[in-house]
From Swiss-Prot:
Keyword Disulfide bond found: yes
Protein name in UniProt: Cyclotide vibi-H
Role noted for this protein: Probably participates in a plant defense mechanism. Has cytotoxic activity, active against a human lymphoma cell line with an IC(50) of 1.6 uM.
Keywords, sorted A to Z: Disulfide bond, Knottin, Plant defense
Organism in which the protein naturally occurs: Viola biflora (Yellow wood violet)
Length: 31
């Protein structure tokens, strides 16, 4: 499922990509 990573990506990319999160609909989610 998609779990919110408590990070938005409206202005900057997701820093949480290092733990497997990605940007979707202006919010970072973990797949």
């Amino acid at each position: 499922g998609l779990l919110p990573c408590a990070e938005s990506c409206v202005y900057i990319p997701c820093l949480t990509t290092v733990i497997g999160c990605s940007c979707k609909s202006k919010v970072c989610y973990k797949n």
